Amino acid sequence: MSNTTLKMSQQEIIYELKYAWSRQKSVSIRFLQNSQETTSQGKIFGIDYDLLYIKEENLVRRIALDDILSINI
């Protein structure tokens, strides 16, 4: 088995982000950070051009939209 990471299409990611943000639902986002796969959980705080802001308890994390691999609501 190869060591490849499956990625949602950009269109699917944007649709899921907008849905979760409009309804203030908690999300789990899988993304690349320094070439490592990372998971973040929280509520979407905002979207600005090519960045996503997600609030995790008392921390706001900034994630580039191009680095997002998948999102689960």
Task: Enumerate the predicted regions with their spans.
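Short, conserved beta-turn/loop elements at beta-strand boundaries and strand-helix junctions
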Residues: 47-52, 73
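Generic alpha-helical hydrophobic packing signal
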Residues: 52-53, 62-64
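Short beta-strand-initiation
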Residues: 37-40, 47-49
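Short glycine-rich, low-complexity segments
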Residues: 1-39, 57, 62, 69-73
